[in-house]
Amino acid sequence: MDPTAPLLTHGGEVEEDYAPARSWTDVKRVLSTESAKLWMIAAPVGFNIICQYGVSSVTNIFVGHIGEVELSAVSISLSVIGTFSFGFLLGMGSALETLCGQAYGAGQVNMLGVYMQRSWIILFVSCFFLLPIYIFATPVLRLLGQAEEIAVPAGQFTLLTIPQLFSLAFNFPTSKFLQAQSKVVAIAWIGFVALSLHVIMLWLFIIEFGWGTNGAALAFNITNWGTAIAQIVYVIGWCNEGWTGLSWLAFKEIWAFVRLSIASAVMLCLEIWYMMSIIVLTGRLDNAVIAVDSLSICMNINGLEAMLFIGINAAISVRVSNELGLGRPRAAKYSVYVTVFQSLLIGLVFMVAIIIARDHFAIIFTSSKVLQRAVSKLAYLLGITMVLNSVQPVVSGVAVGGGWQGLVAYINLGCYYIFGLPFGYLLGYIANFGVMGLWSGMIAGTALQTLLLLIVLYKTNWNKEVEETMERMKKWGGSETTSKDILA
């Protein structure tokens, strides 16, 4: 295939791939064009994901002013049990980023709604496999070494959030469906309204009604289901091109779809559970309440930044998959370069801001001076983590857009669990550096993983990726939806 050959876009217009950038003028043109395309997707998606993460963070903030034990319990529930299920279901839903993005780029828009329905079915069934972790959360947390004073209330809170688990089965696929078509402004508005209403509900249930952590769980469930329902309503009402109604085609090739979903889930879960594991290991240290609380506060701040970069992850995944579907290898490559460069700059800004505010930002979460000092000591590690987190999600997004989930899963397994986690355990427990040692070792694992992924990107043959995308679309495309395929 000639990489500069003209191609038809969805509107029927001829659009060529980039010519090679041979001068500073060419570089500036590519930077300007790709930045605009990237942020048209990344800004709304990032804002929405920050709002979604803000639901958990605001819940921790309100609960933190009830008491330290309550904060530890809810933090453990959301960061261990909640993150486990969140990571697995988000990963399962990420298969849509590959298929919907490439199908949309290739002009097979009619298949997007079918793919989304397949993902709904798969994720809903997956929730039942995750249910025992919620039901037996207290013994699971005991098994992971959590103190009894934290494990029991954390398990009780987890039981109350079971309804939220099932909302994710519809939330994630619907979001991916909209992202693939760059219909992301509505997602941002839904996220903003949901977060605003969540704050009001927390104030009513916890402050006014005095329902404590039970009120926090109730607000958490209502907010997450409200978000999922609002997205589905938008799809049915305003996305007629990609949504043609419920279809029997959703059950076709479902096992092959499951395999791709599992590959996506393994890749993402190995990333998300890695940071979750530091919370678990910290819970086994002496003075576990202060250690867990200080680390949880840092992870909340880190998570807010990570949500922005997950938005960029989604955007670059859409950009790469769309361009590969259109047969534009150089556009895919240049979009990656621009995104990595800009993300690194943003990460450096976050690091500087955290270091400057290291003695002050913990007051948002707690009034305890002891806890504030403990958080301040971890600020430098938090800053380094933020820089690494600025690049790593971008590279993972490229992997999803290109369909390389299996390769990245192996890299994640080796860097995180064979190198990073044992190294962190060695520094934290054997060398007695505590939480700072645990975190330092795990940072080393993330740094190694980022380096290897950058090498993979550098060696990628983008023309070959286009050819593989065309083959994938032939396999998954299917036929046009007919009246026989629509469910009555």
UniProtKB/Swiss-Prot annotation:
Recorded hits in InterPro entries, A to Z, give: MATE_euk, MATE_fam
What organism is listed for this UniProt entry?
A: Arabidopsis thaliana (Mouse-ear cress)
Q: What is the lineage of its organism?
A: Eukaryota, Viridiplantae, Streptophyta, Embryophyta, Tracheophyta
| Result of knocking out the encoding gene | Affected flavonoid levels in the plant. Altered root growth, seed development and germination, and pollen development and release. Enhanced growth and early flowering in comparison to the wild type.
Q: What is its main location?
A: membrane
Give the GO cellular component terms, alphabetically: vacuolar membrane; vacuole
GO biological-process terms attached to the record: flavonoid biosynthetic process; xenobiotic detoxification by transmembrane export across the plasma membrane
- Tell me the keywords, alphabetical order: Flavonoid biosynthesis, Membrane, Transmembrane, Transmembrane helix, Transport, Vacuole
| Pfam families reported in the protein's UniProt record | MatE
- Name of protein: Protein DETOXIFICATION 35
What's its job?
A: Multidrug and toxin efflux transporter involved in flavonoid metabolism. Required for proper reproductive development.
Record localization: Vacuole membrane
**UniProt membrane topology term:** Multi-pass membrane protein
Q: In which tissues is it expressed?
A: Highly expressed in inflorescence tissues, especially in floral epidermal guard cells including those of the anthers, stigma, siliques and nectaries. Also detected in the meristematic zone of the root apex and in the elongation zone through to the fully expanded cells of the differentiation zone.
Entry's Gene Ontology molecular function annotations: antiporter activity; xenobiotic transmembrane transporter activity
- Residues crossing the lipid bilayer are 38-58, 73-93, 121-141, 150-170, 187-207, 218-238, 262-282, 296-316, 336-356, 379-401, 408-428, 439-459
Give the family per the record.
Belongs to the multi antimicrobial extrusion (MATE) (TC 2.A.66.1) family.
NCBIfam families named in the record: matE
